[in-house]
C-alpha cells in the first residue's frame, strides 16, 4: 500500500530464487503475461492500461465512501418524500370521505347509503314547502358565516326551518315528523341547522329526566308512620291517666314504698307482664341474674332489666317513673321535639312554608311553559293538551295565592324588637319582588285557541292586532272615565258651596245630576274590567 492507496499486482513467490537461470527466464515470461492480464478491473471488468490506472479506478469508482453516504441519504429522502405524499393523498381522501358523512344516526334503511345520500332518502317523506328558494351567489344563512354556497362549501337546506346553510353549519341531526315538526319518538333523522338543533324540546333542560320515587317511599313508610302514631297516642293516653291517678289519689311516700299502693294503682292502668315468662331482656338480649334484676315499664308493662330502664321524674309522682328505652323513643322524644318546635318563632315556620311554595312555583312554572310551547308549536290542538295547560296555569296561580297569603302572615306577625322587625321586612320585600317578577313573566294562554286547529303565525298576528284594538279601546274608556271623574269633582264642589250658602234648591238639582255621573263611571269601570279579562 502506498500513499494510503491499495496497490494490486501479481505476487511473486519467494522460492523463485532457488531455481536455475533457465527456469527464471521462463517464469519471467509467464509473469509478464499475468501482469498484462491484471490491468482488467476485477469488479466491473473495465480494461485499464496499467496498474496505477487500475488503482485509481478502484479508489475513485468503487471505494468512495462519501458518494455512498450521499446515495444512501438520497434514497432515504426519496422514500420519506414518497411516504409523505402518499399520506397526504390518503388524508385528503379520508377528509373527503368524512366530509360526506353525517356523525349521527341513520333511519335504519337497508340501501347501504351513508352521509348525504342517507339524508336525502328522507326528502320525499318530510315536507319541503317551507324551503328557501335557491338563487345565484347565496351565502350561508348563519349570521357568523359569510361563505358562498357552492359545490365546495355546500348548499344544504335545514329540514326544520328551510333556510340554506353551508356544510359546516348544517352538521346537526334531529328527528322530524312528515310535517317538519319535532318528533323524537316516531320521526325521521333529518339534517338541520344549529339553531333548530338547540331549539328542540328538552335541549335546555337542566334537571334531566326525573323519576319520582315518592309513591314507593310512601307505600313503605305509611305503615310504619301509622304504627308509630298509634303507639304515641296509646302511650300519651296512659301517661295522662297516670298523671290523673296520682293527682286524684292521696298516696303518701310511706304508702307507696311499704304498702305497694303505687304499684297497685299503676297495674290498674297498664297490665304488667308476668316475671316468670320472660327470661331475657327484650332491649339488650341479656339473661336476668341476681345483679341484672327485673323491672316493669310503667307505660307498656314489659319486663326489662335494670340497666335498660330509665327513671323519669314527674311533679305529682312520689317516686321516679320507670320506662323502657322503646317507650322513651316513642313518647318522650316526640314530646320533646314538639315542645322545642313550639318554642320557635311563629314566622320562622311561615318562612319555611314560603320556601316550599316557592320551589313548587318554580316547578309548575317550568311545566306550564313547556306545555304551552308544545301547544303553540303548530301541531293540532287536542282537548287533553289544552286541559293540561289550563290545569297547570290554575295550579300555578293557586300557589301564587298561597305564597302571597304566607307573605302577609309574616308581615302581620308581631315582633319583639327592631332587629326582628327588620328581618321580617327584608323577607317580605324579597318575597314581593319574586312574586311580581314571576307573575310578569307568566305567559297568557291565547283566548281564541280552538280544539282541532293548529296555532300558526297568522293566528299570532291576528291576536296581536286584536290586542292592540283592545288596548286602544281601553285607553279611550279610561280617558272618558277621567273626564267624568273631573265632572263629579266639580259637581261635588258646587254642592259644598251651595250648602255653605244655604241654597238647598240648587243642592237637590246638583245631587240629581250627580247620580247619572256615578252610574256612567261604574259602567265604564266594568267595561274596562271586561277588557282586562279579554286581554288575559
Swiss-Prot record:
Q: Which residues cross the membrane?
A: none
Report residues binding Zn(2+) 2.
281, 284, 305, 308
Question: SUPFAM superfamilies from the entry?
Answer: FYVE/PHD zinc finger, Rabenosyn-5 Rab-binding domain-like
Ranges annotated as biased composition (Polar residues): 12-31
Q: Could you give one GO CC term from the UniProt record?
A: cytoplasmic side of endosome membrane
Listed Gene3D superfamilies: Rabenosyn, Rab binding domain (4.10.860.20), Zinc/RING finger domain, C3HC4 (zinc finger) (3.30.40.10)
Keyword Transferase attributed: no
- Entry coiled-coil feature ranges: none
Keyword field contains Zinc:
yes
Q: Where is this region: Disordered?
A: 1-31
What is the protein name for this chain?
Vacuolar segregation protein pep7
Amino acid at each position: 500500500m502506498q500513499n494510503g492507496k491499495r496497490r494490486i499486482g501479481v505476487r511473486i513467490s519467494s522460492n523463485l530464487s532457488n531455481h536455475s537461470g533457465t527456469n527464471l527466464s521462463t517464469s519471467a515470461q509467464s509473469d509478464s503475461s499475468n501482469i498484462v492480464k491484471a490491468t482488467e478491473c476485477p469488479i466491473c471488468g473495465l480494461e485499464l492500461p496499467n496498474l496505477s490506472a487500475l488503482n485509481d479506478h478502484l479508489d475513485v469508482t468503487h471505494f468512495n465512501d462519501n458518494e455512498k453516504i450521499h446515495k444512501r441519504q438520497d434514497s432515504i429522502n426519496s422514500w420519506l418524500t414518497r411516504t409523505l405524499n402518499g399520506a397526504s393523498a390518503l388524508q385528503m381522501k379520508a377528509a373527503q370521505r368524512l366530509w360526506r358523512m353525517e356523525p349521527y344516526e341513520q333511519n335504519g334503511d337497508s340501501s347501504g347509503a351513508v352521509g348525504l345520500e342517507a339524508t336525502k332518502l328522507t326528502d320525499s317523506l318530510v315536507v319541503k314547502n317551507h324551503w328557501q328558494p335557491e338563487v345565484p351567489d347565496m351565502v350561508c344563512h348563519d349570521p357568523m358565516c359569510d361563505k358562498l354556497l357552492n359545490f365546495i362549501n355546500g348548499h344544504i337546506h335545514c329540514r326544520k326551518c328551510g333556510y340554506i346553510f353551508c356544510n359546516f353549519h348544517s352538521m346537526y341531526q334531529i328527528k322530524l315528523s312528515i310535517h317538519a315538526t319535532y318528533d323524537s319518538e316516531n320521526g325521521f333523522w333529518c339534517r338541520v341547522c344549529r339553531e333548530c338543533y338547540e331549539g328542540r324540546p328538552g335541549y335546555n333542560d337542566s334537571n334531566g329526566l326525573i323519576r319520582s320515587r315518592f309513591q314507593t317511599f310512601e307505600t313503605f313508610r305509611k305503615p310504619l308512620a301509622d304504627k308509630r302514631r298509634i303507639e304515641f297516642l296509646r302511650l300519651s293516653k296512659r301517661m295522662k291517666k297516670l298523671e290523673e291517678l296520682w293527682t286524684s289519689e292521696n298516696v303518701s311516700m310511706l304508702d307507696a314504698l311499704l304498702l305497694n299502693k303505687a304499684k297497685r294503682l299503676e297495674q290498674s292502668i297498664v297490665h304488667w307482664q308476668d316475671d316468670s315468662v320472660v327470661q331475657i331482656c327484650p332491649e339488650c338480649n341479656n339473661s336476668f341474674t341476681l345483679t341484672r334484676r327485673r323491672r316493669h315499664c310503667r307505660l307498656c308493662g314489659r319486663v326489662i332489666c335494670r340497666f335498660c330502664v330509665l327513671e323519669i321524674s314527674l311533679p305529682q309522682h312520689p317516686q321516679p317513673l320507670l320506662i323502657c328505652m322503646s317507650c322513651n323513643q316513642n313518647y318522650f322524644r316526640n314530646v320533646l321535639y314538639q315542645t322545642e318546635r313550639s318554642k320557635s318563632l311563629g314566622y320562622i315556620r311561615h318562612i319555611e312554608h314560603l320556601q316550599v311554595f316557592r320551589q313548587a312555583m318554580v316547578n309548575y312554572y317550568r311545566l306550564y311553559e313547556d306545555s304551552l310551547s308544545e301547544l303553540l308549536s303548530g301541531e293540532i290542538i287536542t282537548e287533553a293538551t289544552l286541559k293540561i295547560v289550563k290545569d297547570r296555569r290554575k295550579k300555578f296561580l293557586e300557589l301564587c295565592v298561597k305564597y302571597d297569603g304566607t307573605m302577609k302572615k309574616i308581615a302581620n306577625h308581631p315582633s319583639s324588637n327592631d332587629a326582628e322587625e327588620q328581618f321580617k321586612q327584608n323577607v317580605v320585600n324579597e318575597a314581593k319582588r319574586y312574586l311580581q317578577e314571576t307573575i310578569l313573566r307568566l305567559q297568557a294562554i291565547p283566548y281564541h285557541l280552538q280544539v282541532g286547529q293548529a296555532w300558526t303565525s297568522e293566528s299570532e298576528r291576528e291576536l296581536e292586532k286584536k290586542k292592540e284594538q283592545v288596548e286602544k279601546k281601553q285607553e279611550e274608556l279610561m280617558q272618558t272615565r277621567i273626564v267624568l271623574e273631573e265632572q263629579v269633582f266639580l259637581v261635588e264642589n258646587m254642592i259644598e258651596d251651595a250648602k255653605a250658602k244655604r241654597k238647598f234648591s240648587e243642592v237637590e238639582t246638583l245631587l240629581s245630576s250627580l247620580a247619572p255621573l256615578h252610574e256612567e263611571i261604574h259602567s265604564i269601570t266594568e267595561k274596562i274590567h271586561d277588557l282586562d279579562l279579554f286581554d288575559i
